[in-house]
Amino acid sequence: MTAIPNVVDIESSSSSLCQETATETVTVERGSSDSSSKPDDVVLLIKEEEDDAVNLSLGFWKLHEIGLITPFLRKTFEIVDDKVTDPVVSWSPTRKSFIIWDSYEFSENLLPKYFKHKNFSSFIRQLNSYGFKKVDSDRWEFANEGFQGGKKHLLKNIKRRSKNTKCCNKEASTTTTETEVESLKEEQSPMRLEMLKLKQQQEESQHQMVTVQEKIHGVDTEQQHMLSFFAKLAKDQRFVERLVKKRKMKIQRELEAAEFVKKLKLLQDQETQKNLLDVEREFMAMAATEHNPEPDILVNNQSGNTRCQLNSEDLLVDGGSMDVNGRIEIE
């Protein structure tokens, strides 16, 4: 970093230069009175020395202007004005304010590079102390009349607020508190999301662990059964024969049970069919009784004769005769 010359040293050097210029001017004038040779060269020399004095004076004012701009304002202006950092911080479309788009990236990378710390809240407090105001409550946008894009010369108009001013202190404290609260909210949101993600990952990991433990337990049980089977097989060579015989008996019992169920179902179907026929006969008889209240008459057409079966008591009274089968016939 280039050191800025002291104002007192510059003033003393400027005054001494002016005195030397005046002395040389008098000397030249005296020489001109003594000798009239080359007057134009003397005039040009005096003019060049006067121009050098003016240039030195302008350089002093530029250095003085730089001295009035604090390092915080100069560095902040450099950060915002750098196009490389536009995704993180940049000028607004009007270039009368600047916007911090990514507060996390700004704190982690830019602040340590220029200010050697990562405290975003401290940076906000510095802005408040220089009179910057928050433009939009939903984002980190700040504005100051002396802080505009392309107008670096206005930085000398920005002054740090006096600590003795009550009104300024109240506004600064209120703004600082609000910005700190907003900063804490901004910092809490990613932390909450991260905590939720970690909690979900923990629950998923626990669920996976339970599933793996169940699978391991199942595999252990199967291995124990297999080891027990092989142990029995090694001790008793006829174990397989008994196992096969037991299996066959089980299959036979299952077949017999299936055959029994099949026969039972068949008998049930036959019984159901018989019951249906009986019910149908009873229903037909009841229907005939309801439609013909006189005694039932049976007409037999096989022999070509018409025979009517009546009640025995009524026909015997009327002089009917009974055949071998016990039926009463009327010709």
From Swiss-Prot:
- Region spans: Disordered: 14-39
User: Bias category Polar residues: which stretches?
Assistant: 14-26
Could you name the domain of life of the organism this protein comes from? Answer: Eukaryota
Pfam families linked to this entry: HSF_DNA-bind
Residues forming coiled coils: none
**Which cell locations does it reside in?**
Nucleus
As annotated, the DNA-binding region falls at 69-163
Coarsely, its chief localization is nucleus
Xref: InterPro entries = HSF_DNA-bd (IPR000232), WH-like_DNA-bd_sf (IPR036388), WH_DNA-bd_sf (IPR036390)
UniProt's post-translational modification comment states: Exhibits temperature-dependent phosphorylation.
Question: Molecular function terms in GO for this entry?
Answer: DNA-binding transcription factor activity; sequence-specific DNA binding
Protein's UniProt keywords contain Lipoprotein: no
- List residues traversing the bilayer: none
Q: List the GO cellular component terms.
A: nucleus
Residue ranges of the region described as Hydrophobic repeat HR-A/B: 175-234
Q: Could you tell me the keywords of this UniProt record?
A: DNA-binding, Nucleus, Phosphoprotein, Stress response, Transcription, Transcription regulation
* Short sequence motif named Bipartite nuclear localization signal, residue ranges: 245-265
| Subunit text | Homotrimer.
Domain annotation text?
The hydrophobic-rich region (HR-A/B) corresponds to the oligomerization domain.
Function in brief: Seed-specific transcriptional regulator that specifically binds DNA sequence 5'-AGAAnnTTCT-3' known as heat shock promoter elements (HSE). Seems to be specialized for the developmental expression of heat shock protein (HSP) genes during seed maturation. Activated by ABI3.
Q: Which family does it belong to?
A: Belongs to the HSF family. Class A subfamily.
Kindly provide the name given to this protein in its UniProt entry: Heat stress transcription factor A-9
Q: Which organism is it from?
A: Arabidopsis thaliana
